[in-house]
């Protein structure tokens, strides 16, 4: 307590299905967030043997690494249901104020967690690294994934897209 007021720590959670995602793509964002005063947490599946080598490097960056049982496929229901439960526990345990979701399943679970935590004023950011319903995609992708993204957009505070086609599609969503 300083001068009679509490200083709140700011916690942000980065979520992706693959452990190497943060190491390969988010290091500069992590540094930027830390300079802004955020304590950075990273939730991912750390048990995939291919990605184990990055754990020490991520922790040396000052990032709190958390294993969740997230699967790369949205159709692995049991693992993803367990991952959602683990994600909600992290949000509550560390008083997470913002969650930045990456990868399709990370985006799905992160935004669903945001919906379940609306009473906490959790800010939900989703970076779509290319929607799966692009022109020329299989009919299943264009019909099912478009509808899923449209629904999940309601639980998204900030949507970041990386190309013009995705930007135009995102314009049809209600954030």
Language model regions located:
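Short, Lys/Arg-enriched N-terminal segments with co-localized hydrophobic residues
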Residues: 1-7
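N-terminal strand-loop element at the rim of the active site
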Residues: 9-79, 165-174
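Structural motif
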Residues: 11, 97-98
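Active-site proximal beta-strand in glycosyltransferases
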Residues: 11-13, 115-132, 149, 160
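Nucleotide-sugar donor phosphate/pyrophosphate-binding loop at the beta->alpha transition
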Residues: 78-85, 122-125, 133-155
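Glycine-rich phosphate-binding loop signature in dinucleotide/nucleotide-binding domains
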Residues: 90-97, 119
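A short beta-strand/loop micro-motif in the catalytic core of glycosyltransferases
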Residues: 99-100, 155-163
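Short His-centered aromatic/hydrophobic patch
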Residues: 101-106
